[in-house]
């Protein structure tokens, strides 16, 4: 046991306290990231396929643990903040893994058009009820509070996705969702406008 010299209920309380502290620290870090987004330079050339492969590698421990298969298709090149676009795709993919079912799958696809990219993250989870499909991009919103407690997190992941897409002149929305799964789409311009 983690706390061999204390009673089980005290040990459980200490574990919960540690989890809450970690969650609060993560929330503070994410809020600081969000408040500093506008200062981040968005002039890097980003190729998405290698970035998605890197994200899959980073998420392998979680996807392996939950038995979720990750697949990618397509590629695209855009100008923006490498760190922020990584965070956007990571958050969407991590969410799709967490809220999937055991043995499920997540597919990340990129379609490049002349002046924009369309990124889709599809999962085989239980879906997002229609009345929540806009709310999920608001800070601290959660559809399934018991699930979010199980996996931790501050309820800011999709809000950060929305902020990053908006900062790059793009948009994000729930393209489709049912009890068979959800697809979240992100449209991003390939070039950033000159305004700060």
Language-model regions, residue ranges each:
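Short helix-loop "hinge" at the ATP-lid/N-box region of the Bergerat-fold HATPase_c
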Residues: 96-97
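Acidic ATP/Mg2+-coordinating residue in the GHKL
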Residues: 123
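Conserved glycine-rich
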Residues: 169-170
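Short conserved segments within the C-terminal catalytic ATPase subdomain
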Residues: 62-72
